[in-house]
């Protein structure tokens, strides 16, 4: 029986590979089902012989308790966006300045969810979401329910690969039809449906929704030399690889490819939102390196947003967590990029004045980045006698006078006791990217605030079960879950807390950069503006905003209250030593290193406080030159940049 189970497992996996990867079925559905049922029967009789890569592990479901955090061994970076031919030409010019003979691989930008898959000796070990690029969620059990992801590779490799999980338009339509029949809320678009599916706790639901994937990157070190070779290897290993791509050194040919794909975009079985252009040589990719946010060797061209006409019925003004008052237009409903849109942002008062937007106007509505509906401009030919829009002078929440600073485009409420400002701040603090207090969403925050239980973020950690039980709709079990989530948030790394404080200009990535240097929230109470401005990737605006916040007496009180409540103040990642030999310096590696490999050299430089980049510019402080160094070394000499060799680096 053990031998027969192994035979059936191998045979069915090969049939699945032919069907999903090669798109060339080698057996009829009825024959496949017959063999599959035989395997199920044998495994039920002899469960001790069930193999890890058995296709039966794709069927049925498990109720998961939740998703654990997963730190990526290889960070996932965002891509620089481009919206015009000129931006692509500028990218080409930057690359060709370093590598005149560079070629590019243009691939479709799938509108799905980024996933990372790690295999050991050919077996799938971890499937994870992108998260913030450094820490995602372990969704391995759900990943195993996606039929075109192999549980076992065709070779016993230890490898980490990247790709996109998506939902086809056909599956999306079927799911929404079923949800409509069941009286359930329909998904807005395939991407939202895929995102919701990957975070399902019931793996049987994941299996039914028929997600699919396209893989495009080997994140771990590879023996391949070119990106197109990587795609070929991924296909050979059993992954689904998108068949549409263009290899060329010509930006004209890439532009023609983009226009061809854009024209047939609606004919594809899945959603795409652009084309990604990558330097094809992996060695050149390594030389070009990364900025803080994105690789220098790739760029994502985003398709122009779909546009529709709609009438503005009214305008709502809402207060955000920093006091900014944002206008939102209520519209006659229109279908836009697969969703019904009835509200769109008007950005700010300067935008309203510039575009002369009035209630009753017919306007052009589009989705900014295919996500946020926005008003582009007014169709003046359809304007009648609409009056100029009245701009509020008082805060719609607290009634205090609004201010319009000369250097800002927005109205702002500066009353620190404004109810909306406080509520939005509390919501932000509890949000996933900040303290990630599961369940503490806007509705419950509003109830807590109106009941007088919370007035600032520190109050969250003083809440009791009795407080929650007094709220309408909160039962004992829900109260226990909320308290558990609040308690769990105390152990977050400090960059989550810093971001959660809602300081202007301090996003999640900036928070991490700051705490890599300072290590502790308490240290920011005495941090100097000029010191913060020296941190690579920041600058004077961020430094000023941070110091102004922590110079307030209320900030010291808040930090003390949070610390007393047991909230972690320490950064759990690797701290940068501000006294390190190369702290704050921008360094470029070039040429062949004889004693260290490039990753070892980069790790050492970063441990010494340096930022390692891929190109030489006026901002470069130091170049480490190995043998056969080329254009980067010559450019460094012409700019008068300090140059050292590998021996010098090894001795530090």
Curated annotation (Swiss-Prot):
Instruction: List the CDD domains.
Output: BRCT_DNA_ligase_like, LIGANc
**Does Cell wall biogenesis/degradation show up as a keyword for this record?**
no
A Pfam family name for this chain? DNA_ligase_OB
Q: Which GO terms describe its biological process?
A: DNA repair; DNA replication
Annotated PROSITE patterns: BRCT, DNA_LIGASE_N1, DNA_LIGASE_N2
BRCT domain boundaries: 577-652
| Catalytic activity, EC | 6.5.1.2
What EC class is this? ligase
- Reported cofactor(s): Mg(2+); Mn(2+)
User: Record's family?
Assistant: Belongs to the NAD-dependent DNA ligase family. LigA subfamily.
Q: Describe the task this protein carries out.
A: DNA ligase that catalyzes the formation of phosphodiester linkages between 5'-phosphoryl and 3'-hydroxyl groups in double-stranded DNA using NAD as a coenzyme and as the energy source for the reaction. It is essential for DNA replication and repair of damaged DNA.
Query: What is the protein name given in its UniProt record?
Result: DNA ligase
Record the organism: Streptococcus pyogenes serotype M28 (strain MGAS6180)
């Amino acid at each position: 029986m053990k031998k027969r189970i192994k035979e059936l497992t191998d045979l069915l996996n090969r049939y699945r590979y032919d069907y999903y990867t090669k798109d060339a079925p080698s057996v009829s559905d009825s024959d496949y089902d017959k063999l599959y049922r035989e395997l199920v029967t044998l495994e039920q009789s002899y469960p001790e012989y069930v193999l890890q890569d058995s296709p039966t592990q794709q069927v049925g479901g498990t109720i998961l308790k939740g998703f654990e955090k997963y730190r990526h061994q290889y960070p996932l970076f965002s891509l620089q966006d481009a919206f015009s031919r000129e931006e692509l030409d500028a990218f080409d010019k930057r690359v060709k300045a370093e590598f005149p003979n560079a070629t590019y691989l243009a691939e479709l930008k799938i509108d799905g969810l980024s996933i990372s898959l790690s295999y050991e000796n050919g077996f799938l070990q971890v499937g994870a979401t992108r998260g913030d690029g450094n820490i995602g969620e372990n969704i391995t059990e759900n990943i195993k329910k996606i039929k075109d992801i192999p549980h076992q590779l065709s070779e016993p490799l230890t490898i980490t690969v990247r790709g996109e999980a998506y939902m086809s338009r056909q599956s999306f339509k079927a799911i929404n039809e079923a949800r409509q029949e069941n009286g359930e809320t329909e998904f807005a678009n395939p991407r939202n449906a895929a995102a919701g599916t990957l975070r399902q706790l019931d793996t049987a639901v994941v299996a039914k929704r028929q997600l699919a994937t396209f893989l495009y990157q080997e994140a771990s070190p590879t023996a391949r030399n070119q990106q197109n070779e990587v795609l070929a290897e991924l296909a050979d290993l059993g992954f689904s690889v998108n068949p549409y791509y263009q290899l060329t050194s010509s930006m004209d040919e890439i532009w023609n490819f983009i226009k061809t794909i854009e024209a047939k975009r609606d004919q594809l079985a899945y959603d795409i939102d652009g084309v990604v252009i990558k330097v094809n040589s992996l060695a050149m990719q390594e030389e070009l390196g990364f900025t803080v946010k994105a690789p220098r060797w790739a760029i994502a061209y985003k398709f122009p947003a779909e546009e529709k006409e709609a009438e503005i019925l009214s305008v709502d003004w809402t207060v955000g967590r920093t006091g900014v008052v944002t206008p939102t237009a209520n519209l006659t409903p229109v279908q836009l990029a697969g969703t019904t849109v009835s509200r769109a942002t008007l950005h700010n008062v300067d935008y309203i004045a510039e575009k002369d937007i009035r209630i009753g106007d017919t306007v052009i509505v589009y989705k900014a980045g295919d996500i946020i509906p926005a008003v582009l401009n007014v169709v003046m030919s359809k304007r009648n006698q609409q009056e100029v829009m009245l701009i509020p002078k008082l805060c719609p929440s607290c009634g205090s006078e609004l201010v319009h600073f000369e250097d800002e485009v927005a109205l702002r409420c500066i009353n620190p006791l404004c109810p909306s400002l406080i509520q939005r701040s509390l919501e932000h603090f509890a949000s996933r990217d900040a303290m990630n207090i599961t369940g503490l969403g806007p509705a419950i925050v509003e109830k807590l605030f109106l009941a007088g239980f919370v007035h600032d973020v520190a109050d969250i950690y003083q809440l009791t079960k009795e407080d929650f039980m007094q709220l309408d709709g909160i039962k004992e079990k829900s109260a226990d879950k909320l308290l558990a989530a609040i308690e769990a948030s105390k152990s977050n790394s400090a960059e989550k807390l810093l971001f959660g404080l809602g300081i202007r200009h301090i996003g999640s990535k900036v928070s991490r950069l700051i705490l890599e240097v300072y290590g502790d929230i308490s240290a920011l109470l005495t941090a100097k503006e000029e010191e913060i401005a020296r941190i690579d990737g920041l600058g004077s605006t961020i430094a000023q905003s941070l110091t102004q916040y922590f110079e307030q007496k209320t900030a010291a009180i808040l930090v003390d209250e949070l610390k007393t409540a047991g909230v972690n103040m320490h950064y759990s990642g690797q701290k940068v030593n501000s006294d390190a030999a190369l702290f704050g310096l921008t360094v470029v590696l070039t040429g062949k290193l004889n004693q260290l490999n490039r990753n070892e050299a980069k790790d050492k430089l970063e441990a010494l406080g340096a930022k390692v980049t891929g190109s030489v510019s006026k901002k470069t402080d130091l170049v480490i030159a190995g043998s056969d160094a080329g254009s980067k070394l010559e450019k460094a000499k012409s700019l008068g940049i300090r140059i050292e060799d590998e021996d010098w680096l090894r001795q530090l």
